[in-house]
Amino acid sequence: MKISVQNFGIISDAAVEIKGISLIAGPNDSGKSTIGKIFYSLIRGLNPDEDIFISEKNDSIRRFYQNILKILRDNKDIDISIYQTSRINDEWISKIESLAENFVGTQKKQLIRYCKFIKYQNDLEFNSIENKNFEIDDYFLIEFNDDIQPIFNEEKITSIFIEDLEGTATLQYNFNSELNKNINIFFNNSFFIESPSLIDKSLQDSILYEKRFSRDKKSHLKFALANESNFILDDENQINEIDKIIKIISEIINGRIVVDDFQGVLYEKNGQEINIDNVALGIKGFGLIQLLLKNHQLNSRTLLIIDEPEIHLHPNWQVLYAEILVLISKKLEIPILLTSHSPYFIEALKVFSEKYEYEENLFKSINPIPWCSQSIQPLNHFLFLL
C-alpha cells in the first residue's frame, strides 16, 4: 500500500509506501506521527465492521423515529398509535411526510428533516463509498480533532492518493472525506503503538468488559493485547517461528507479561510474579510485542505502526528491539511502519536488515525552510538524521 499526501496539517507533501519494514526518520514536529495516523485511519476506515454498522444504523434510525413521535405527541389531535411501528420503511416515511403538511414552522421542518435522515440511513449500504467516507471521518476526528486543513496555506485542498494491489483512489478532505471511488485494500487491520504504558492493570478489564470493536486506537490495541484473535493460524512453520521469537523476547526481558482474567496483569520473572505497576516501560515495550504474537494478532494483512519506539528503551535495548522487528517482519511477513529520530535505532535496523538479507524502506522528513510545512520523501539509503 502506498499513499501520497498533500496539504495535510503540517505536511505539504509526502509519499510513503509500506514494504516490509518502512521507517520515517526525522526530528520532532516533522509530520512523522501524522503519516502513521493517516495509515491507521485509512486502513480501519476502509474496513468497517458489519455488526457495528448495523447496530449504529439501527440506533440512528431509532433516534430519529423517537424524535418524530415526540413531535406527534405534542399534537393532541393525532392518534400516535397509528404511527407507532416496528417497520420503519418507505411507506411509513411517506405517511409522516404527508402528515408533516399539517404542521407549520419549526415542527414541520424537523419532521421533513428527520424523514430525510431515516430514508438516507435506510438506503445506506455497508460496503458503500458513503459508509467508508463516514468511517474515515470518524477516525480522522478521533486522531486529529479536525486539525487537518493545511496549517500554512488554508486555501489549498487536502488530498490523499491511495495506491494498493486492489486498485487506486483519491480522497479529498474539506471538513468531510470524499473518496472518488469505492476501493477495497489488502490490509484489513492495523495496530498503532504510541507507548507501552498502556500495559497496566486495566488490561484485565479488556478481557472482562472491553468491547470487541473500538475506533479508538488505544482501546483497539488493548483488546488485542488481552484477547486471542479469531484468525486461525494453521501453518506449522509460522507457529514455530512465532514461538521462537516469543522465546527470544522472554530471554531479553528475563520473563513474560501475563494477562489473565483471574490473575490479572503480571510480569513473571524467574518464577516470581511482579506487580505490573512496578515494571519498567522498556520491559513493557518488549512484552507488548510478545502479547500480540502470543494472541496471533499480527499477520500479513495487519499493519503494525510503532511511533518512536526508542523513547523508553536504553540504547542497548533499542538494538535488540530493532532485531526483533526485523525478525517479525521477515519470518512472519508482518508489515511494519516505524517512526524514529534515534541514530542507534536507525543504524540497528540497517545492520539487521543486512544481516537477515531483508529489504528496508526509509523515508526522511525534509524541511528546507524552518517556518514552512514538511515534506516526506523516500531515500535510497540510511542516514543519521539528528
Regions flagged by a language model, labelled:
Residues 1-49, 266-386:
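Switch/communication elements of ASCE P-loop NTPase nucleotide-binding domains
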Residues 4, 45-295, 299-301, 369-386:
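Phosphate-coordinating catalytic segments in nucleotide- and nucleic-acid-processing enzymes
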